[in-house]
């Protein structure tokens, strides 16, 4: 899907700052430095719109990106970063929970997991939490270019087994920002959830 004019509209920390209107929203969640910003930039074909950082825990707000007045991408603060204080983690946690559990415009969540490693306890908690709230989930296994293509099936199997994957509510796609594979399939899922036309 071609996006011509993506814009960061607001970096929100509470419900009163969320954008008005009824555009569908797709949220991106995952551990710090799992590649959320790289995925967003790849999907919209804009380097640098979503800020990529070598410093984990950099995103500390809900960043709402308006894509041509068609939908919003919402970049959610990364979890699992030890150097963020406990108080900050609790603050982020309540902010994220408020958004993910109560936002009517939210049509699906893309949960990013590093393809090179087994899902962490934080990954499992996030998946179970999204399942509890009955949010449609797309698991994107990032950095798949670092995995031999012959091991893709094994990676998928490990992720599904570890998460106790529910195939009726969830989908799984392997993705590489470097080699650009998986982006078309991710867009197809987004368009289906947000009921978008080309």
UniProtKB/Swiss-Prot annotation:
Residues 22-196 form the EngB-type G domain. Its cofactor is Mg(2+). Pfam families: MMR_HSR1. One of its GO terms (biological process) is division septum assembly. It comes from the Bacteria. GTP binds at residues 30-37, 57-61, 75-78, 142-145, 175-177. Keywords: Cell cycle, Cell division, GTP-binding, Magnesium, Metal-binding, Nucleotide-binding, Septation. SUPFAM superfamilies: P-loop containing nucleoside triphosphate hydrolases. InterPro entries: G_ENGB_dom, GTP-bd, GTP-bd_ribosome_bio_YsxC, P-loop_NTPase, Small_GTP-bd. HAMAP family: GTPase_EngB. Belongs to the TRAFAC class TrmE-Era-EngA-EngB-Septin-like GTPase superfamily. EngB GTPase family. Necessary for normal cell division and for the maintenance of normal septation. This is Probable GTP-binding protein EngB.
């Amino acid at each position: 899907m071609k996006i011509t004019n993506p814009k960061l509209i607001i970096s929100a920390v509470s419900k009163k700052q969320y954008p008005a209107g009824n555009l569908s929203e797709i949220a991106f969640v995952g551990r710090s430095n799992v590649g959320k910003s790289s995925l967003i930039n790849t999907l919209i074909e804009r380097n640098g719109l979503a800020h990529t950082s070598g410093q984990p825990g950099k995103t500390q707000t809900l960043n709402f990106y308006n894509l041509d007045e068609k939908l919003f991408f919402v970049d959610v603060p990364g979890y699992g970063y030890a150097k963020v204080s406990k108080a900050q983690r609790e603050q982020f946690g309540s902010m994220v929970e408020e958004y993910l559990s109560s936002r009517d415009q939210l049509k699906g969540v893309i949960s990013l997991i590093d393809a090179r490693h087994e899902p962490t306890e934080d990954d499992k908690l996030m998946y179970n939490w999204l399942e509890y709230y009955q949010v449609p989930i797309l698991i994107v296994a990032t950095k798949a270019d670092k995995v031999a293509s012959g091991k893709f099936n094994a990676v998928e199997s490990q992720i599904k087994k570890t998460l106790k994957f529910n195939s009726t509510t969830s989908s799984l796609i392997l993705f590489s920002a470097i080699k650009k594979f998986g982006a078309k399939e991710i867009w197809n899922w987004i368009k289906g959830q947000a009921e978008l036309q080309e």
